Amino acid sequence: MIFAFDLFEPYEFQFFRNGLIVSTIAGALCGLLGVFVILRGMSYIGHGLSHAVFGGAAASAVMKVNYFLGAGIWGVVSGLLIARVARRRVIGADAAIGVVTTASFALGLALMNRYGQASKSIEAVLFGSVLGVKVADIYAVSLVAFLGLAVVVLGYRKLLFSTFDRDVAQVSNVRVSLVEAVLLAMISLTILVTMRVIGTLLISALLVIPAASARMTTNSFSRLLWVSPIIGAVTCFFGMNLSYHLDTSASATIILLDAIVFIIVYAIAGTRNRAKMASLGHL
């Protein structure tokens, strides 16, 4: 009975319940969009856009503008700007990400240093804070999750073509630039609604690790789209619970749990591959 009481103790607190709901939905959402991040070789995009959104969050705090409105517009504009610069091919996509996001992050730091009263809220954005999660965050992450699911379901074929063969997609009358812009906008919105719990410094890991783990379990694109969200949601759920009982940062615990899952899947996949190679050697 004591163990059961301790196990369910955090559920007595409203802030924990809010954080658990937001993080679990966010884990599934990041897992879903992370599939495209991994397959498109855009692992750096999550890291970059999280830094860009930080600039918007800092500006919103300083100007006392609604967080979702200010940081959301900033993040989406940054994503679209990256896509536009990259399409011109004057510089590569990685360079475009570096220029736009580091400039935005630097602006955020400058604002934070100039207006010290905003430092506490900015620190929460950087590292995440389950205490700052409100009911409004639940609505926000649920809305973005619904939009993300709608984009994937309605644009499944276009996303599939543009992800695996950009040239074939263009020949097939798929507006690749529009698809990429929508995807970047969705990633920006996902980062925005997830920052409260995970923080900007670790959000990119939540976009990459669950999808990378899922990628080692299947070669099917359709299976990836449900395996990755499951991994993301489960690790966020248990990570939140562990963080309370271990008295550790929620974001750090979630990412460490994701990393453990990745290591386990990697070890199992490696063992299976060696077994297959050994069986072929006996033929």
Language-model segments: residues:
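Transmembrane helix-bundle core of multi-pass membrane transporters
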Residues: 3-18, 89, 97-157
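Transmembrane alpha-helical segments in multi-pass inner-membrane proteins
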Residues: 197, 201-252
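Cytosolic-side transmembrane-helix boundaries in multi-pass membrane proteins
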Residues: 8, 248-283
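Small-residue-rich segments of transmembrane alpha-helices in multi-pass membrane proteins
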Residues: 52-62, 100-111, 132, 176-186, ...
